[in-house]
Amino acid sequence: GEEEYQKMLENLREAEVKKNA
């Protein structure tokens, strides 16, 4: 659902931040 989708996007964003750090 929409909530799961938003959580998934949040997780992807966090992964990108950690990768770029």
UniProtKB/Swiss-Prot annotation:
Superkingdom as given in the UniProt entry: Eukaryota
Entry keyword NADP: no
Residues carrying the site annotation Important for selectivity: 5
Keywords carried by this UniProt record: Amidation, Calcium, Gamma-carboxyglutamic acid, Ion channel impairing toxin, Ionotropic glutamate receptor inhibitor, Magnesium, Metal-binding, Neurotoxin, Pharmaceutical, Postsynaptic neurotoxin, Secreted, Toxin
Binding residues for a divalent metal cation: 10, 14
Location(s), subcellular: Secreted
Modified positions (4-carboxyglutamate) in chain numbering: 3-4, 10, 14
Pfam families (UniProt xref): Toxin_36
Modified residues (Alanine amide): 21
InterPro entries the UniProt entry points to: Conantokin_CS
Protein family membership: Belongs to the conotoxin B superfamily.
Record function comment: Conantokins inhibit N-methyl-D-aspartate (NMDA) receptors. This toxin inhibits both NR2A/GRIN2A and NR2B/GRIN2B subunits of N-methyl-D-aspartate (NMDA) receptor-mediated calcium influx in central nervous system neurons. Induces sleep-like symptoms in young mice and hyperactivity in older mice.
Protein name listed in UniProt: Conantokin-T
Native source organism of the sequence: Conus tulipa (Fish-hunting cone snail)
Lineage: Eukaryota, Metazoa, Spiralia, Lophotrochozoa, Mollusca
